[in-house]
Amino acid sequence: MVASAPLATDATANPQRGSYWITTFGCQMNKADSERMAGILEAMGYREASAELDADLVLYNTCTIRDNAEQKVYSYLGRQAQRKRSNPNLILVVAGCVAQQEGESLLRRVPELDLVMGPQHANRLETLLLQVDSGQQVVATEDHHILEDITTARRDSSICGWVNVIYGCNERCTYCVVPSVRGKEQSRLPQAIKLEMEGLAAQGYKEITLLGQNIDAYGRDLPGITPEGRRQHTLTDLLHHVHDVEGIERIRFATSHPRYFTERLIDACADLPKLCEHFHIPFQSGDNDVLQAMARGYTVERYRRIIDRIRERMPDASLSADVIVAFPGETDAQYRRTLDLIEEIGFDQVNTAAYSPRPNTPAANWDNQLPEEVKVERLREINALVERCARKANARYEGRTEEVLAEGINPKDPSQLMGRTRTNRLTFFSATGADGHANKAGDLVQVRIDAVRSFSLSGSPLPH
């Protein structure tokens, strides 16, 4: 369970603190953490810098799920370390999963660092920076209860917001470093989640995405049993609890785990009108033996039953997933079964990755690693299939009218707005309708889809 945070002190409100810059690597959880840390910095008196090289405080919120993301962090750090040698007042912070994984060894590798902090400490940024102010070089990577955030996040969007509902992960997938860097599951209380959503609604937000590394596990660490003998707090119960927040038009959630994706959850998504018809459910492999080696805890048959039930209740629902190719020992036949499953289900989008050995994971030590050329070829082939499936899935939208939540101006064409359908299709459309009505960010617009591409739609707003 997430702990309550103490109130900030007046001593931290310093308008002379200078400017900050945050660079975020990785997942939506990291992006949400960065928004909260930006809010903390601004409450302390920092302002956002116009460029990284102008900032008085530089924070890298890091990701370790893939080796290339980790190496990119060290490249960025090298530039900032050189800058700090000529500007000792620069404050240099590494947060997130690389910080948690490397800990004090980061200080040995980059001695110019002032603060190394794991993701469990994001809401303690203020306290940790005060220690830096006193001349300390700080490492905060110990396991800790995650504090409720009492500082307003500085969010990148004023229309769509992320709300964390559970932190950490208790799974032990053999390829994944997340449990060791994000810690055990810690669920927020339903009333705290709803209160945050009500605050966002009061600011004009229209869509909320509930976030968790394994969101279907929500509530497992909270006390309480219902008269029927089940857990009192589940994701299904949470969706019912927050559904009536006035002003919020749409609710999404991510990321799901097939092991815990229940029929009761599917029924709630079908019955609650604010729940969007888009589901991101990683399957990782289309072969049962590979899934067992990954310690995923489900079979391909179980995954198919989930998809069948979703389509039975919500025939037009869109489906996205994650998949890993070239897992240690994966044969060509096993890989082909993954391709077959993608084509059979007809995913709208699949995030693909070649297996990357990560420190402190069982699979990294196995002696059946596949050659790099196999990884490259399998990734190339599966990406081509994913694009074909996405284009085919999008083709069914041509000529249809879809509700699109306008999120902002298309940066490539200021005459257009961009937003997403309920099924999460990125859609571009004219800001001004044929009737002269000017649509704006935050509007729910009925858009006739005139053209489709692999990963986006474009269309025309219907008259009001």
Curated annotation (Swiss-Prot):
Domain MTTase N-terminal per the UniProt entry, residue ranges: 18-134
InterPro entries associated with the record: Elp3/MiaA/NifB-like_rSAM (IPR006638), Methylthiotransferase (IPR005839), Methylthiotransferase_CS (IPR020612), Methylthiotransferase_N (IPR013848), Methylthiotransferase_N_sf (IPR038135), MiaB_methiolase (IPR006463), rSAM (IPR007197), rSAM_horseshoe (IPR023404)
One Gene Ontology cellular component: cytoplasm
GO molecular function: 4 iron, 4 sulfur cluster binding; metal ion binding; methylthiotransferase activity
Class of this enzyme: transferase
Sites where the protein binds [4Fe-4S] cluster 1: C27, C63, C97
EC number, as in UniProt: 2.8.4.3
Binding, [4Fe-4S] cluster 2: C169, C173, C176
One Pfam family here: UPF0004
Catalytic reaction list: N(6)-dimethylallyladenosine(37) in tRNA + (sulfur carrier)-SH + AH2 + 2 S-adenosyl-L-methionine = 2-methylsulfanyl-N(6)-dimethylallyladenosine(37) in tRNA + (sulfur carrier)-H + 5'-deoxyadenosine + L-methionine + A + S-adenosyl-L-homocysteine + 2 H(+)
BP-aspect Gene Ontology terms: tRNA methylthiolation
Function according to Swiss-Prot or TrEMBL: Catalyzes the methylthiolation of N6-(dimethylallyl)adenosine (i(6)A), leading to the formation of 2-methylthio-N6-(dimethylallyl)adenosine (ms(2)i(6)A) at position 37 in tRNAs that read codons beginning with uridine.
Assembly behavior: Monomer.
Protein name: tRNA-2-methylthio-N(6)-dimethylallyladenosine synthase
Source species of the chain: Synechococcus sp. (strain CC9605)
Name of the encoding gene: miaB
